[in-house]
């Protein structure tokens, strides 16, 4: 994760900035804002209230949201998509205002949303915009205790040399930006280990892909398999419904038959959504204390790629996997070189994924050049060569 180049904005700051942007960018919006809004948006900074008074802050949130909704309602009529003078900047400003007016707030207690009373929601909206200055920066969690704002960088590298073979900067949230999804994309556009049809037929032409558990989703493993790659990716640990009790691997899944058999030998059919409920079969089961605490008995959802995930967990227990997996640790040094400078984490200087992705590629190229020079890269008779031992 890289920290973004802008400050994370609170809800009040975002609403004020978004309304001001609409007033600047949308035709006739300045007059609309002055006419329908309760607050004065021509004054710089935040509205002047007693910030130590919770009631005053709550009232300000309601006023800001109501102002935003009022502006949007009027401009939806006066400045539709076909209005002369409306350009991309105007459309973006209106879209941003609509987004920030709803992403962080919810109706106050006892309100159905029509009374004009709003409060800041006690949750983080999925894919939340954290700044009106950089609308692609996102809030995410590296773990339950580590929260970060910015962008996510992905690297592919050769474990023996540490040379970076591919990289990509993405937003920190979104299904297309997960480690697993980007890992599959990078493997698919690999230019250094081309796979030919004869190689696929011989089953020796794919890559050997190493990664931590974030790169090993069921879909990613299926994609790697279909592309002819081998994986040395750590599986995610299984959770137990009861401490010390059974895991999903203690249940037998028969995909062709569409059934699941529990450790006690009871078999149930899976539903179309791949859920299975053992229900009353658990009532007198002697193994219940190891299986579930639910009054209605054990229920579970079987993953679409359950077979691949089970195979990955079985692979992780083999001596071959345990010997090969530490290879991935060598890439951590490369990651540290990309993410830090003189012992400090690098902070991005650009806005948006496009410019930051270009910066990441430039940094990766520079680090590769440094690594090659360290390995003896030299220029001989106009040709770059690596010195041999």
Predicted regions and their residues:
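Anion-binding and metal-coordination hotspots
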Residues: 1-389
């Amino acid at each position: 994760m890289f920290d973004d180049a802008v400050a994370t904005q609170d809800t009040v700051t975002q609403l004020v900035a978004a309304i001001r942007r609409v007033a600047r960018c949308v035709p006739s919006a300045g007059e609309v804002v002055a006419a329908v809004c309760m607050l004065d948006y021509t004054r710089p900074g935040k509205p002047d209230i007693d910030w130590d008074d919770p009631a005053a802050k709550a009232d300000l949130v309601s006023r800001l949201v109501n102002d935003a909704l009022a502006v949007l309602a009027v401009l939806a009529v006066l400045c539709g998509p076909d209005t002369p003078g409306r350009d991309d900047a105007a459309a973006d400003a209106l879209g941003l205002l609509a987004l920030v007016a709803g992403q962080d707030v919810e109706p106050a207690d006892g309100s159905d949303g029509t009374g004009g009373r709003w409060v800041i929601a006690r949750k983080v909206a999925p894919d939340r915009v954290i700044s009106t200055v950089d609308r692609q920066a996102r809030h995410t969690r590296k773990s339950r205790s580590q929260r970060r704002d910015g962008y996510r960088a992905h690297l592919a590298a050769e474990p023996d040399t540490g040379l970076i073979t591919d990289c990509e900067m993405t937003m920190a949230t979104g299904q297309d930006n997960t480690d697993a999804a980007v890992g599959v994309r990078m493997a698919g556009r690999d230019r250094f280990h081309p796979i030919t049809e004869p190689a696929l037929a011989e089953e020796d032409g794919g890559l050997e892909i190493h990664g931590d558990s974030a790169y090993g989703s069921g879909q990613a493993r299926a994609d790697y398999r279909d592309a002819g790659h081998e994986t040395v990716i750590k599986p995610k640990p299984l959770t137990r419904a009861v401490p010390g009790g059974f895991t999903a691997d203690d249940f037998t899944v028969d995909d062709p038959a569409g059934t699941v058999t529990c450790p006690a030998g009871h078999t149930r059919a899976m539903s179309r959504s791949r859920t299975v409920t053992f229900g009353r079969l658990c009532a007198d089961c002697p193994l219940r204390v190891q299986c579930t605490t639910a009054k209605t008995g054990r229920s579970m959802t079987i993953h679409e790629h359950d077979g691949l995930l089970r195979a990955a967990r079985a692979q992780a227990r083999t001596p071959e996997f345990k010997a090969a997996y530490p290879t991935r640790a060598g890439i951590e040094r490369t990651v540290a070189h990309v993410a830090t400078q003189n012992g400090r984490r690098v902070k991005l200087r650009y806005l948006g994924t496009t410019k930051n992705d270009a910066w990441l590629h430039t940094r990766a190229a520079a680090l590769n050049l440094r690594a090659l020079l360290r390995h003896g890269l030299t220029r001989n008779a106009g040709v770059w060569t690596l010195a041999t031992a």
